[in-house]
Design a protein with these regions (language model features):
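N-terminal export and membrane-targeting signals
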Residues: 1-13
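C-terminal motif of bacterial Sec signal peptides marking the signal peptidase cleavage site
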Residues: 17-20
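Primary mode marks residue(s) on the alpha4-beta5-alpha5 output face of response regulator receiver
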Residues: 22-278
């Protein structure tokens, strides 16, 4: 995971390169793959728009549920032998992430506590010819643990719904491998902002750190200034990008953060030139 920071309004001055790269960082939403012990056939799977419990049973989305189906598809071109988890992830996750963005109404889901959850057949199911893949979206609690959700997520990110599931961090996204997600209405140091930057396609070469920074720096500084409503010296634009393995699985984005110089309680959204909250 590549991490950088720049002061909003003084982009390019005193940028410190921060080392460290991982495919998955604890405390940051990432995809989850589930190999169920049950063996449903494709005809028995829940449909797009339905909500499910832990056993893939359909439940009313107005009631507490584990996930919401955003897409159902088939693995193709993999032959009869089980291909292994990495190859399955590389085919399933890009399609599921695209379906998730369309279902939520925005590609900004990487800046939220919503995460893709992918299910596929067990080894026995694969051996009997099952090739289905089920894409669902689940929600993380502010402590980073998955929790049951009440209410549908269809088109949630089209408008004010972003704030309901926004990622906020206890520690610096620019400096910490695990910034520690937390509730946005409590003390925090940084807020993920709308305007996730898509760098390319998973089949393309992974961009270098310098290429990521060249595109992310100006983009994130602009996104943070628009989010805050002013360019300030006490709020920085931070950004985080995924590593090469995650890139091959569809994680081709950069998430921008509005990072303050000290912890605060409240929101930076629309703060303008007012004092940083206590």
């Amino acid at each position: 995971m590549r991490r950088r920071r720049a002061a909003v309004g003084v982009l390019g001055l005193s940028l410190a390169l921060l080392t460290g790269c991982t495919a998955s960082v604890a405390g940051v939403p990432d995809a989850e793959v589930v190999r169920p012990s049950i063996l449903p056939r494709a005809d028995d799977l829940p449909r797009t728009g339905q909500c499910t419990d832990g056993a893939l049973g359909v439940v009313d989305c107005a009631q507490p549920h584990e996930g919401e189906v955003v897409g159902v598809g088939q693995f193709t071109g993999m032959g009869g032998a089980h291909p292994g988890e990495r190859d399955l992830r590389r085919q399933a996750l890009p399609a599921c992430r695209a379906a998730m963005a369309g279902y939520l109404g925005s590609g900004d889901h990487d800046a939220t506590r919503l995460q893709a959850r992918v299910l596929w057949p067990s080894l026995d199911g694969w051996a009997r010819g099952d090739r289905w893949r089920l894409c669902t979206v689940v929600e993380l609690a502010p402590d980073g643990q998955r929790r049951k959700r009440t209410g549908p997520v269809k088109d949630l990110l089209k408008a004010a719904g972003f704030a309901q599931v926004q990622l906020c961090a206890q520690r610096s996204p620019a400096e910490e491998a695990d910034p520690g997600i937390t509730a946005c209405d409590g003390p925090h140091l940084a807020e993920a902002v709308p305007g996730v930057l898509d760098l390319g396609e998973p089949g393309e070469p992974t961009p270098s750190g310098e290429q990521v920074d060249a595109r992310a720096g100006e983009h994130c500084a602009t996104a943070v200034a628009g989010y805050v409503g002013a360019r300030r010296q006490d709020v920085f634009a931070s950004w985080r990008a995924f590593g090469s393995q995650a890139w091959s699985e569809g994680y081709t984005t950069v998430v921008c953060y509005a990072e303050a110089t000290r912890p605060f309680t409240g929101r930076l959204w629309g703060l303008g030139t007012q004092d940083l909250p206590a």
